[in-house]
């Protein structure tokens, strides 16, 4: 299921060919007066398998030149550390973010990026649309479910792993460069009640909570009571270790 099939087109493999055309594209951004460019690091470009001890220098050099090109045109890079691109090796060998070992691999990635790009990048996002864990778990955290397992349990355990990783990354970013600013990124819109009936207001609030939960944890540093109560009702028990 992980292989490309012959006879099909995969335009996203090339997309706008930013890898080869970034200089002319960034020059156009500058010409249009852009002040910020949000982009994402490809994890496998830095650590091809994800669990290597040493990074790929060619990948690091590419992004370094890209960031310098941004500054050349007066553009501040806003960098997402990982954007739905968990290395395939980490999925097939470790099970993606269901595995706590992912924290160490992600920390290694973050340390490498924060150290190499100190002075070039100060605005970071730890994960793209972290709440997509609940809606598209393979895309979000590289999870393939096993037959008969509690899928909600697996998704929230993976969410716990990523939330811990996000906190670790934030702490590390500030240790390496106090000028770093680290934020989170959510895929969400506001749910509005269909009518003025309390039932509809309650339903809208419940839907909002499923997304805002991820912001609450990262902002307050603890799980909100409404999440704990929901897990209790659903029989979800997270494994939390130091």
Task: Please give the residue ranges for each predicted region.
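Active-site region of glycoside hydrolase catalytic domains
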Residues: 1, 6, 50-51, 61-242
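N-terminal structural segment of carbohydrate-active enzymes
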Residues: 1-56, 60, 66-72
